[in-house]
């Protein structure tokens, strides 16, 4: 049976993916004054960075050590593919366009988040004492 933490993380990850899909199905919002294209790209990086962190945290609850140890890489790959499908999806939404530069910033955000998760996880696992019952 999954732990409560795992259920919450997976639920949050799927809910966030749904929010991304719904947001990209809506007409293009008017940008806030002063944000311009730089703010838009930063939001893409932030959006997919957060998605990657949620994915990595959820994947790290999987009990398979091969999957668990690759949580950051798997999360990055899934987030990048989701970003690609999101941009393709927007080509079918009136008043929206699929933008390859948006996808690039989705990938940048996902890569930074995956790297940060990997570094954090490496440091936490080195600092944690190894018990005699834990698998090596």
Cite the ranges covered by each PLM segment.
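Membrane-interface capping segments at transmembrane-helix boundaries
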Residues: 119-131
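Interfacial helix-loop-helix junctions of multi-pass membrane proteins
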Residues: 30-38, 83-107
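Internal alpha-helical transmembrane segments of multi-pass membrane proteins
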Residues: 63-77
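"…centered on the first transmembrane helix and the immediately adjacent amphipathic helix/loop
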Residues: 1-58
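Membrane-interfacial alpha-helical segments at the cytosolic side of multi-pass membrane proteins
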Residues: 47-62, 108-121
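Lipid-exposed faces of alpha-helical membrane segments in multi-pass integral membrane proteins
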Residues: 8-22, 46, 77-81, 85, ...
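Short helix-capping/hinge motifs at transmembrane helix termini and TM-loop junctions
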Residues: 26-27, 60, 94, 121
